[in-house]
Amino acid sequence: MFFFDFLFFFFVCFYMCFVCCVTICLPIELTIVSLLVRGNHFLRFYWCGLERCIACRLCDLICPSLALDVRVGWSFGGHRFADWFTLSYRRCIYCGFCMHVCPTDAITHSLFVMCFCCLAMYLLAPKFLLFGCCFMLFDFYLCFV
């Protein structure tokens, strides 16, 4: 039985090789990607206002899709900080490697679409979800935790 199925699918594939091409041409222009669809990556800060990132560039090196770009800046005291931190949301595959490899826990990720993940926040403040303010408040809170 398996052999006949294999043989049938082989002939179907062989037949489709000689049929005219039906590939749809994709548009060249870039599509708009909403940041709230799959979440936001952002740097966290200490309560005193200093950023946690020490610009070790481990996140930049471990990213499989090369979505991060971190450039090192030096302060007057000789401390390193991230002078330039950019994330390409078109390249990011949301694997989370950058969050797990960070030694200072500087990169965090908002929890995708919050209305599905956080039922208590939806029950306590449904009007914030209607206007989209809940995402901004929660992201601002995570930034300083």
Curated annotation (Swiss-Prot):
GO CC annotation terms, alphabetical: membrane; mitochondrion
The keyword Iron-sulfur is annotated on this UniProt entry: yes
Keyword terms: 4Fe-4S, Electron transport, Iron, Iron-sulfur, Metal-binding, Mitochondrion, NAD, Oxidoreductase, Repeat, Respiratory chain, Translocase, Transport, Ubiquinone
Residues reported in the UniProt entry to bind [4Fe-4S] cluster 1: 53, 56, 59, 102
GO biological process: aerobic respiration
A Pfam family the protein falls into: Fer4_7
A single GO molecular function term of this UniProt record: NADH dehydrogenase (ubiquinone) activity
Cofactor note: Binds 2 [4Fe-4S] clusters per subunit.
Residues noted as binding [4Fe-4S] cluster 2 in the record, renumbered to the chain: 63, 92, 95, 98
Keyword Protein biosynthesis among record annotations: no
Subcellular location: Mitochondrion
Catalytic reactions of this protein: a ubiquinone + NADH + 5 H(+)(in) = a ubiquinol + NAD(+) + 4 H(+)(out)
Main subcellular location: mitochondrion
Cofactor requirement: [4Fe-4S] cluster
Domain 4Fe-4S ferredoxin-type residues, every copy: 43-73, 83-112
Described function: Core subunit of the mitochondrial membrane respiratory chain NADH dehydrogenase (Complex I) that is believed to belong to the minimal assembly required for catalysis. Complex I functions in the transfer of electrons from NADH to the respiratory chain. The immediate electron acceptor for the enzyme is believed to be ubiquinone. May donate electrons to ubiquinone.
Family: Belongs to the complex I 23 kDa subunit family.
UniProt protein name: NADH-ubiquinone oxidoreductase subunit 8
Gene: M-ISP1
